[in-house]
Amino acid sequence: MSDNFGQSSQFKTISHAYGFEDVGIVPGEITINPDQTDLSVYIGEYKLDIPVLASAMDAVMSPEYAILMSQMGGLGVLNLEGIYSRYEDYHEIIDRIVNSDATQATNLMQEIYAQPIREELIAVRIKQIKDQGAICAVSFTPQNAKRLAPVAVDAGADLVVIQATVTTARHLSKSNVGLNFDTLKEIVKVPLLVGNCASFGAAKELMNCGIDGLLVGVGPGAACTCLLYTSQSPRDATLS
């Protein structure tokens, strides 16, 4: 094909992708009595009566809420790179955030998260959850997973989630030895969940690493501002 200047033009073929709001679940041809249904799932050896994982965000998941989620049959994932592993009295920190106004928010959050992660508090939070008989799932970012995930497992964590906005099996960095999920799985020896991803290829490569679960989807949730400020957000469903 030639453009108006007589020069050859090349076009890249793109596929249509859909957000969750574009996809509907269509009822099938068979119905079943509610008392005969079973929504339970297993992650490794751990059974969840309801297939719900609560987000590993400081604004969502606290040790207390993780305990309640487990008691209700779901799973609450605690972020152990946030306020719960930086402060002994996290209730005071939450109160400061809640009572701040919009003009203070950015500076306050930068101040709060400037404090270092304390490995001894990782063990304290895990014990806090385990002492109530709850399943303990904890979350780390890929850059800290090799250092902190073994600490959490030694403290009694039942499941480990490695999560970033976008996570891939292959990653370019200045590090000579990057994060290898196959190796990490052998080290922690507990169910390993990884996310997030939003493409078939990335999902397949992560699953081939031997992980136990995959988190699919990259925004735009209630806490995501990409769509608001850029009018762009990753789509999470494709048709082939």
Model-derived regions: residue spans:
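Conserved small/polar residues in nucleotide/adenosyl-binding loops
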Residues: 229-234
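Hydrophobic, small-residue-rich alpha-helical packing segments that form membrane-like cores
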Residues: 128, 132, 142-188, 201
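Glycine-enriched alpha-helix->loop->beta-strand junction motifs that scaffold or abut catalytic
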Residues: 73-75, 155-159, 208-213
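Glycine-rich phosphate-binding active-site loops on the catalytic face of alpha/beta enzymes
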Residues: 77-86, 161-168, 215-228
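N-terminal capping/small domains of soluble enzymes
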Residues: 1-129
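Catalytic cores of alpha/beta
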Residues: 66, 147, 199-212
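Short beta-strand/loop segments at the ligand-binding rim of alpha/beta enzyme cores
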Residues: 51-52, 131-137, 185-195
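Glycine-rich beta-to-alpha transition loops that act as phosphate-gripper elements at the mouths
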Residues: 56-61, 139-144, 193-202
